[in-house]
């Protein structure tokens, strides 16, 4: 297990900035106002060859109400999980009542805790930070997270005890590790072709605000991992959560809700939307959550379009299905059939994230979609299916000539890409292209993922070439012309 370092403190003391600095990413949203971070956010960092996990948390100040109470609970859970707690304070503001309350809580925990005074650039750090010794948590460590000052010294002083413990543990188990390495090397050659299959499946849960994405995430995990509150825009960042189900690894991505562009004016919401779109591009399977009571909206269709253009596999979950009468359910199903007819390959589930109804069957469709997207298909199989499709329904005539499909092969996967070579293939009507796509989908039993077919037309080998006449041919032409003139 990698050691865990939790970053805690009041709002707006620089926890997310330090998180980004330690993980060398820009995963955590950063803005100059309090309360931006809400859920626990995990990242992996490396110092001097030693890897560790960093947890970014929401700010706590003791005056929480509403959704802030949920944020504080997430921060307290992070403290319980951590091996080391970095308690961040603001060197410019000085010690506050909230700092004292957090320190009182930390002293009761059996954790290695270090006080980190941030924002020390441009001030006399020693004099400004002297009052923090009243917190009775030991030495005060000075840093400027936004500029990266003092970070290396902080890691040296805080990680050194933990590194010593890990080194002793590594020495105790080194002999056993050598045997395991030998066994791994023997099996690695045989299992190398399964490397892709062994990667965790990234599942992004997307949808409009307040449709139940975080509730569904917590239901799948069986714990209150992300904040759930009856208010649109509760989730602000994309939260990556590893999990295991039936001995298979997944990474759940809980994302912020996406509204229509004209309604998005807040800067933080704009960044949240960008994070959601990045999560769609980063994942393997997209789980679109739709509110049954609100019905399918144009914004849902926009999200679907972005997911399909990104080539992601797709599963649709209609949430809040419980409590609806049969008439309303039939009306909703008719609307879904009408508006989602263009993605008939995607599995549709009717669920209740709050009560767990139908949630267990989602992963059957997720696995099916992922396996379809990453399926390897031989060239012989693709060509045979192409020939069968032509035999059942010939390509149409274009300018009096029959379009000829000559050859097919795989052009990639995730999503499946099929390349078809032939004559006049660029002139094929869209109806025949859809026929080929559906024929391949049915023959290969591909569900849950789009299929992309690329048509390539053979170049004319004589295009642009000039017919060169030899000297003897020129003499014959002149003699023939002279003979015709004499006649």
Curated annotation (Swiss-Prot):
Binding site for GTP 1: 9-16, 56-60, 118-121
UniProt-listed SMART domains: AAA (SM00382)
PROSITE patterns documented for this protein: G_ENGA
GO biological process terms, semicolon-separated: ribosome biogenesis
Entry keyword annotation includes Chloroplast: no
Domain KH-like: residue ranges: 375-459
Keywords: GTP-binding, Nucleotide-binding, Repeat, Ribosome biogenesis
Binding site for GTP 2: 207-214, 254-258, 319-322
Stretches assigned to the EngA-type G domain: 3-166, 201-374
Single GO MF annotation: ATP hydrolysis activity
Subunit structure of this chain's protein: Associates with the 50S ribosomal subunit.
Similarity remark: Belongs to the TRAFAC class TrmE-Era-EngA-EngB-Septin-like GTPase superfamily. EngA (Der) GTPase family.
Role description: GTPase that plays an essential role in the late steps of ribosome biogenesis.
Protein name as annotated: GTPase Der
Lineage: Bacteria, Pseudomonadati, Pseudomonadota, Gammaproteobacteria, Alteromonadales
